Amino acid sequence: MASNGVTNCNANANVWRFKGNGATSDAAAVTLRKLAFGMFKNCTMNSGKTILFPTPGEPSAHSNFRTCPEAEEAVAAAARSGMANSYAPSPGVFKARRAVAEYLNGELPTKLKAEDVYITGGCNQAIEIVIDSLAGNPSANILLPRPGYPHYDARAVYSGLEIRKYDLLPESDWEINLDGLEAAADENTVAMVIINPNNPCGNVYTYDHLNKVAEMARKLGIMIISDEVYDHVVYGDKPFIPMGKFASIAPVITLGSISKGWVNPGWRVGWIAMNDPNGIFVSTGVVQAIEDFLDLTPQPSFILQEALPDILEKTPKEFFEKKIKAMRRNVELSCERLKDIPCLFCPKKPESCSYLWLKLDTSMLNNIKNDFDFCTKLVSEESLILIPGVALGAENWVRISIGTDESVVQEIFDRLKGFYDRHAISKEAIKLSGHAINQIVVSVN
């Protein structure tokens, strides 16, 4: 008996009949957020430098990438109107759904209606809703790109969907290895995910390649989940082409948001669009599953949904042009600075998104085992946090976010250069190592 008259319970864990859900830990372990902020917590001040954390893909913190005044005013006006203080309908506010449909329609041969669109709390929630809606069959599997965006992996793990990977080919402008994709599929495959414009590779797929992807999906009898959040961050020569153009070949679920194009990821507004002119999603119950799942989840802010039509319709093209111009400058600057850091190689200059996807050559560095080791030591020595490629499914690659001010890009490469200079194996050592290997080969022969 405790002094306050309350009996102390045995503190051993087996007294209690509840415990945390281990599936959440398994899923969170593969997220970028877990990795990046874990590395952030391991930063030390030994370098005497401020922490550079250009990894979450959020350029909104920098002056050249602030969202436009028209978007800010749309949100303020929605809040002042008094018309957006209630709960929103589960599928989304009708005017927001209609505005997204009109925004996406463009050159689509079959136009979307408001009823084909569902509003979500950013694209990540859209991913969760779609993945969970496909996870009813315990033997089902999904095809994900390698490299790719790990939130798909995380949600598939949490939902119990088996993950199978297909490769993107650096020697072919990061096109999908369609033979490998077909080999990875079986009778339990339900969907493939395509990210276009591509995070992390920065490529934009051509019309011909997307047509081949659609034909392969039809052959396999699977849907295409097309992640198009970077559709407004294209600065190369290839135009962005929506996957929905090919929905008559295979049904397409398009995922998107205003986070990247309008540089406001904290606003959390995204969407799911059902490109399905043949009614396949209805006949297979996918539409019903998504609508049921929307009834289980919290709705996005009514204020943001009320503002969404004005955000999509009233943003001037000059806003996007300014942002694209800044990204082009940063890409050129980064590629120039990479010439002084030969352990990092960019196989293809990016055409979109806000990243450099770089191959890491550890043979040029002392005491660096792999990409994770590289990034961990970079944090410790330079207070610079980058994403190791293994987190995106590709060992010995590194992702650098360059969606930031030019001065920050310069500082990123100053620190990378300093790190490389300290760890670089001298050319003489490389020659000696090669000579030793040749001597071994000769002696064996």
UniProtKB/Swiss-Prot annotation:
One of its GO terms (biological process) is response to jasmonic acid. Pfam families: Aminotran_1_2. Expressed in roots, leaves and cauline leaves. Keywords: Aminotransferase, Pyridoxal phosphate, Transferase. It is an enzyme of class 2 (transferase). GO terms for molecular function: L-tyrosine-2-oxoglutarate transaminase activity; pyridoxal phosphate binding. Its EC number is 2.6.1.-. PANTHER family: AMINOTRANSFERASE TAT3-RELATED, TYROSINE AMINOTRANSFERASE. Induction by wounding requires COI1. Belongs to the class-I pyridoxal-phosphate-dependent aminotransferase family. This is Probable aminotransferase TAT3.
